[in-house]
Amino acid sequence: MFDAYLYELSWMLAALFFGVGMGTLTGIIPGFHVNNVALILLALAPGMLSLGIPLSAIAGIIVSTGTVHTFLNYIPSALMGAPDADQALSLLPGHRMLLSGNAARGVAWSARGSQLGLFLSLPLIIVARIAFGPEL
């Protein structure tokens, strides 16, 4: 029984680390969204299942990729593709912050906002677990 628990835990840890890597890539590369990775993983899911990878590990990859993506997706919009000074007012707030020298502060506040949203959503996970039962 304990071996089955360790087997599942090892797959979830591997999925977590793989998802963190994929989320970092999708968050840093402009135009490469986390939904693309989720779609690719869902398309490859039958092959992954036939290789013995549990469905919970595939779901763990998707969830961890999405979580890391939310923390990092502000960085390219704040630090890349900055317009000229006369165009900055008509574009994204991240560009205005970059031109005024406050891009690092904007990235930090975006990460804090993502972290706060994550912490505030944790009680909802408990409610969903109670509402849907132990076997999600």
Describe the function of each predicted region.
Residues 22-25, 73-77, 95:
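C-terminal ends of transmembrane helices
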Residues 109-136:
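Membrane-embedded alpha-helical modules
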Residues 11, 15, 35-42, 57-65, ...:
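Alpha-helical transmembrane segments of multi-pass membrane proteins, especially transporters
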Residues 52-56, 96-113:
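Membrane-interface alpha-helices at helix entry/exit sites of multi-pass transporters
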Residues 78-106:
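Flexible loop linkers connecting adjacent transmembrane helices
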Residues 25-28, 67, 71, 115, ...:
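Hydrophobic/aromatic residues within the transmembrane alpha-helices of Major Facilitator Superfamily
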Residues 1-55, 134-136:
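Helix-loop-helix hairpins and the membrane-proximal interhelical loops
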Residues 29, 64-89:
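Juxtamembrane transmembrane-helix boundary signature
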